[in-house]
Design a protein with these regions (language model features):
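A cross-kingdom marker for long, charged
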Residues: 55, 59-178
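Acidic/His-rich structured neighborhood in mature extracellular/periplasmic domains
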Residues: 1-88
Length: 178
């Protein structure tokens, strides 16, 4: 519970290793349910991709966010991602640029652990993008891909979605084009 004392809690800055400001934004009591459910879902639906690359990690995390949205339909999408409304708006306004950035830098199908860590883990902003971008902006893209996939595949149940480990198949069948 000490992770949810509020973003302005003075104790976070007094620790031997202070909690960065960007991380404190997600340390409110409103984040408890999201974090608890995310933890539970990642244990229930383990990441076992056919190919361990960035796009697979993006879509896996997008699937977790999509399922969270189904469980908590009243919660704003940006809150489920740990973003502010402004950060989600930035992603919406720059969706095509995010996608182009991943393709032009050959990151989308990268299997390099440092690339996956850099883009899938929490950060003050997404490396290589403006400081206005949220950390993990590519996870928002994964969430959008899953949304497009489920929109096209109306017969796919949540159970089937979560069981699918061929993330390249989800990408292909989503027909995602920002």
């Amino acid at each position: 519970m000490d992770n949810y004392l509020g973003k302005d809690c003075i104790f976070y800055s007094m620790l031997a290793v202070p909690v960065p400001v960007y991380a404190r934004q997600k340390m409110t009591r409103e984040d408890i349910v999201r974090d608890a459910l995310t933890g539970w879902l990642t244990v229930e639906f383990v990441f076992r991709p056919l190919k361990n690359d960035l796009i697979s990690g993006m879509i896996y995390q997008g699937k977790i966010m999509y399922l969270l949205q189904q469980i908590l339909p009243e919660e704003k999408g940006y809150r489920l991602l740990g973003f502010t409304a402004e950060q989600e708006e930035w992603c919406r306004n720059n969706e095509e640029q995010i996608w182009r950035f991943l393709i032009e830098n050959d990151y989308l199908f990268s299997t390099q652990q440092r690339i996956m860590t850099k883009y899938l883990n929490d950060a003050p902003f997404t490396s290589g993008m403006p400081v206005e971008s949220p950390g993990r902006a590519v996870v928002w893209t994964g969430y959008r891909i899953v949304g497009k996939y489920m929109q096209k595949k109306k017969n796919v149940s949540l159970e089937r979605l979560m069981a699918e480990q061929d993330y390249h198949k989800i990408l292909r069948e989503a027909g995602y084009r920002p």
